[in-house]
Amino acid sequence: MSAVLRHVLLLQRDVPAAAKFYRDGLGLVVNVCTERWAELGNAASATGATPDASGFAASAPETVIALKHVDSEAHRATGYSPILSFTVSDLDQTVNNLLRAGASLDGPILYPPRGKVAALRAPDGHMLGLFEPAEGTAAEAQV
């Protein structure tokens, strides 16, 4: 099975303000928005999703941008954002494939209850996030 692109992850200091910017500036539909996480999809006219009076989607569009809160300015520096995030069926095999292709791990593989998570740096410096859902959990869980 090939990897499935989940979203482009942008690290933010103020997630609600950033979601408002993308909604108002680009017409993206805000599917989820909390103080620490937001998901934005294609414009309502392109997906059939209908935004409510506040501009937030009543139905979930395909996610194209995810916003994640960070406190540290270092995490927002070049090389940490954006992060390409993928859902994979076999994280260990995918990590090995990427390491052989020239990537390097950026920290240990983590094993939270919802599945396995790994962060890697591609040879060109871009960050990749991998997520393998735990058996019986939804593949849509956040990295």
Which residues does each predicted region cover?
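Short glycine-enriched loop/turn motifs at secondary-structure junctions
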Residues: 2-4, 76-81, 111-112
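Short hydrophobic/aromatic beta-strand element in the GNAT-like acyltransferase core
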Residues: 39, 85, 117-119
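Conserved active-site alpha-helix within GNAT-family acetyltransferase domains
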Residues: 16-25, 118, 127
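Vicinal oxygen chelate
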Residues: 95-143
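Conserved short beta-strand elements that form part of the metal-binding/catalytic scaffold
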Residues: 29-78, 127-133
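N-terminal beta-strand motif that seeds the catalytic metal site of vicinal oxygen chelate
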Residues: 1-19, 82-84, 134-143
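Short amphipathic alpha-helices within nucleic acid-binding modules
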Residues: 20-21, 92-97
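Conserved acetyl-CoA-binding loop of GNAT-fold acetyltransferases
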Residues: 24-30, 102-104
